[in-house]
């Protein structure tokens, strides 16, 4: 257990210690080879919140501005400060810099108990190394252990890389999701976003 704690840390602000069971030796090797460690928070202190916000702004501002939502710094920060949100944060060991995070809440969506993912954000230099998959896997296992039957998330229709990523892991549009509009001419108008969901599971 001491070896595991070198890579996944807990405090009174973070998740319950029994959830350390989610971490396997395979996880430890994965994190070690990446040169990162993970911390899981129920609440972010101001400095770390700003780091998470900066990563979202860097990765997502352009997509927000292309949509009908637009981008507003203060509104996004307000959303990220919500007490119900929990964060899985990934830090680089050498620089101690935040390089990625996943934020989520336990909730009910369309009458289904679920873990709702708000953000999966990665710094560009850590992409393509299965970190997104690792975060999604552990979110799914966490949902399963909390008896949350489903995982929900919202994704911009213009974010094709994200759509392909989620489809690969069996996410499909929920019936409550905005739908495409198809015209007789063959023209298709995509909504700004889709609501995707899948069942939580303990095995990946």
Curated annotation (Swiss-Prot):
Subcellular locations according to the entry: Cytoplasm; Nucleus
Site (Essential for catalytic activity): 119
Positions annotated to bind acetyl-CoA: 120-122, 128-133, 159
Domain N-acetyltransferase: residue ranges: 39-202
Reactions that this protein is recorded to catalyse: N-terminal L-seryl-[histone H4] + acetyl-CoA = N-terminal N(alpha)-acetyl-L-seryl-[histone H4] + CoA + H(+); N-terminal L-seryl-[histone H2A] + acetyl-CoA = N-terminal N(alpha)-acetyl-L-seryl-[histone H2A] + CoA + H(+)
Keywords on record: Acyltransferase, Cytoplasm, Nucleus, Transferase
EC number: 2.3.1.257
Protein family: Belongs to the acetyltransferase family. NAA40 subfamily.
The name this protein goes by in its record: N-alpha-acetyltransferase 40
Organism, scientific name: Schizosaccharomyces pombe (strain 972 / ATCC 24843) (Fission yeast)
